A protein has these predicted regions:
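Phosphate/Mg2+-binding loops and adjacent switch elements
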Residues: 6-123
Length: 123
């Protein structure tokens, strides 16, 4: 998993380890690391291309770029768009009026659309 590490107090590329905390790598990357430990490599980097190059050298098969829908320097094999069911992207507006970082029409770049917060019905 490659994340920018929003609001972290450091810069550059960091491969997460037990010595890191939310201040050095950001809150979401530390959650990923704590959940998956040694099963998944978690990195933070402002430069996603450099991080991908490191992973290519390490022969990583799958790279998940967290919050990278707007990342134009990387050509993804697959784009996944997540949207809250309580505030779906198609009823929202671009920031600062709404919560969207891009125009709604750009949802057409998504290969998959996942709505979070949906009720699950069992029969």
């Amino acid at each position: 998993i490659i994340s920018r590490g929003y609001k972290r107090k450091t810069s550059g590329m960091i491969i997460l380890s037990d010595k890191d905390d939310f201040r050095t790598v950001g809150d979401e990357p530390i959650q990923y690391f704590k959940k998956f430990k040694n099963e998944v490599k978690v990195m933070v980097s402002e430069n996603r291309v450099n991080a991908l190059n490191v992973n290519e050298t390490d022969k990583i098969d799958v790279n998940i770029l967290d919050d990278a829908y707007q990342q134009r320097l990387v050509k993804p094999d697959m784009n996944i768009l997540l949207s809250s069911i309580k505030r779906p992207f198609y009823n929202d507006y671009i920031f600062p009026v709404g919560m969207l970082r891009e125009y709604r029409k750009n949802a057409n770049r998504a290969d998959f659309l996942i709505f979070s917060g949906c009720l699950v019905w069992y029969y």
